[in-house]
């Protein structure tokens, strides 16, 4: 099964035949992430240009979409960069350039907005009966020093957005973080992060004494 297709004339492969069309249920424009729920439904963060989240059933049939226009109004997005799902089927979208996480039900109806965790580049939810939401607060290296100081933060939250912890600082040493582009939540005490500026992945083991780190280069 394939969802979406880039026209051969785009991205330097030949002259453009026509301007980029408005969002279509089966045509993406630089999608950034994908997740499936327990029923096999597929959710796509159609990220860099279409600014929407889309739902398909397990056979790939279109079901629903968020608004699909760039903006700051509830339900609008500006670069939905990461997407994850909880046990109840709620969808969490890292609305990166708006500095917030938007939460939708399984039908992509907006339920909540969390705008207190910086610029979320990546989100994930731990497995198990009591789930936690993790979100990276990341910014590129060329930003001003005051912003760079928080490129290593990762927030740990209850699913209602309550922050229960925060760890990490900007840097390229072990245990420091540099523009976390992706997170995998293996469990509530162990996460994997991919850092695009430091060119590495780290495994962080969380505990009362703070995160312990191993990395792969």
What positions do the PLM features span?
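Eukaryotic scaffold repeat domains enriched in small/polar residues
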Residues: 1-217
